[in-house]
């Protein structure tokens, strides 16, 4: 692929978090000059989803040699191709980090159906549709028809069949090689010393309602009331105001809350290395990069028995109810030695390779190269 102009057009309307990480991993695997990125900062998601197609239609040069177009589902691909028909000849690949067909809203009337409809149109306009998990793929396809049935008349049929044949699951490539490896014992400390240490809980998610911060706060307050020893870090990105559930948590937990707020990357990694358990309380998760990152740094993952989590973690790491979560954490905090034995068993059996950038990025590049080869033949 040696050409003066790049062959691969990468578009990301929400260039931050896992969206940015994915593109970074792909760029590292591509030859210099093979690709060109067009992006917008990871702010104001709703406006990015509504208007980015028009923005990029004006920005992408018309004098190009693109043969592959790779974009996240935030972009309304059908709109872009309508505005820029010269890009229609590209092999168009849409990547779903999440899907809007099952995005949880507090009230049905709050749902803006246009986002989900744009995703369906993007799939119809695409040549290939990639999902970061089987759960993401299944939940999207299973809800295409129910979503379209919300239209009061002139029901649209047989759309799932058109999309399904384009779909493929390709896990998000986590660049574990950039992470420090946690040592079993800190130098100078014995196993007995570690048993005396209180359990460090970490919640590293976006501060938004779909991550269910209320369940986290309720659980931590119950542990605090039961007078078990623990400490907790609540980090993750906050794009808006602090959730109301977090407003008085510092007063409620006192010194047990050792970190509260977003941490810069270096400090974040250091904190993960001190953690014992990483918790998810999510109502909305299609992969869970933060959970895997924390697990790789030595934190034992505990997650709901739903969404993507049963696809990734063994049943011992999953809980079915809020009471089960509290009970599991209570027992671990009360008996650190029992916990650390179970954590050791988890890491002996868990395979991180199936989620690693080293294993997965070549599969993405094979897709790009195949499409370019098809165009050249």
From Swiss-Prot:
Q: What lineage does UniProt assign to this protein's organism? A: Eukaryota, Metazoa, Ecdysozoa, Arthropoda, Hexapoda
Keyword Disulfide bond found: no
Q: Which Pfam families match?
A: Glycos_transf_1, QTMAN_N
Q: Supply the source organism for this entry.
A: Drosophila melanogaster
GO: which molecular function terms?
Answer: mannosyltransferase activity
> What SUPFAM superfamilies does the entry give?
UDP-Glycosyltransferase/glycogen phosphorylase
Keywords (A to Z) from UniProt = Glycosyltransferase, Transferase
Q: What's the EC number here?
A: 2.4.1.110
Q: Which family does it belong to?
A: Belongs to the glycosyltransferase group 1 family. Glycosyltransferase 4 subfamily.
Task: Give the protein's function.
Answer: Glycosyltransferase that specifically catalyzes mannosylation of cytoplasmic tRNA(Asp) modified with queuosine at position 34 (queuosine(34)). Mannosylates the cyclopentene moiety of queuosine(34) in tRNA(Asp) to form mannosyl-queuosine(34).
Reactions this protein catalyses = queuosine(34) in tRNA(Asp) + GDP-alpha-D-mannose = O-4''-alpha-D-mannosylqueuosine(34) in tRNA(Asp) + GDP + H(+)
Q: Which residues cross the membrane?
A: none
> What is the protein's name according to its record?
tRNA-queuosine alpha-mannosyltransferase
């Amino acid at each position: 692929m040696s050409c003066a102009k790049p062959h691969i057009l990468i578009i990301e309307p929400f260039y931050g978090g896992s969206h940015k990480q994915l593109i970074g991993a792909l760029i590292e695997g591509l030859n210099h000059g093979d690709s060109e990125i067009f992006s917008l900062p990871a702010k104001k998601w709703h406006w990015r989803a509504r208007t980015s197609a028009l923005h990029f239609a004006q920005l992408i040069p018309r004098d190009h040699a693109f043969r592959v177009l790779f974009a996240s589902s935030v972009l309304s691909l059908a709109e872009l191709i309508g505005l820029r028909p010269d890009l229609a000849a590209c092999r168009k690949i849409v990547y779903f980090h999440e899907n809007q067909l099952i995005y949880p809203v507090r009230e049905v009337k709050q749902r803006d159906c246009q986002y989900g409809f744009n995703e369906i149109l993007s799939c119809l306009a695409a040549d290939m549709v990639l999902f970061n998990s089987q759960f993401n793929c299944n939940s999207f396809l299973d809800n295409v028809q129910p979503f379209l049935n919300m239209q009061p008349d002139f029901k649209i049929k047989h759309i799932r069949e058109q999309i399904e044949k384009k779909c493929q699951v390709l896990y998000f490539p986590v660049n574990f090689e950039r992470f420090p490896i946690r040592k079993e014992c800190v130098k100078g400390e014995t196993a007995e010393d570690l048993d005396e240490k209180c359990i460090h809980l970490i919640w590293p998610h976006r501060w938004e309602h779909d991550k269910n911060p209320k369940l986290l706060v309720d659980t931590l307050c119950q542990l605090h009331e039961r007078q078990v020893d623990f400490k907790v870090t609540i980090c993750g990105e906050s794009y808006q105001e602090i959730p109301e559930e977090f407003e008085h948590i510092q007063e409620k937990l006192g010194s047990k809350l050792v970190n509260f707020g977003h941490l810069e990357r270096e400090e974040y990694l250091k904190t993960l290395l001190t953690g014992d358990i990483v918790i998810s309380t999510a109502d909305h998760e299609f992969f869970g990069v933060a959970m895997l990152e924390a697990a790789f740094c030595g934190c034992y993952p505990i997650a709901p028995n739903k969404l993507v989590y049963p696809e990734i973690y063994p049943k011992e790491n999953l809980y079915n109810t809020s009471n089960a979560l509290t009970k599991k954490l209570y027992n671990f905090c009360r008996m650190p030695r029992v916990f650390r034995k179970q954590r050791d068993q988890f890491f002996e059996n868990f395979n991180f390779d199936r989620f690693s950038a080293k294993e997965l990025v070549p599969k993405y590049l094979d897709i790009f190269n195949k499409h370019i080869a098809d165009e050249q033949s």
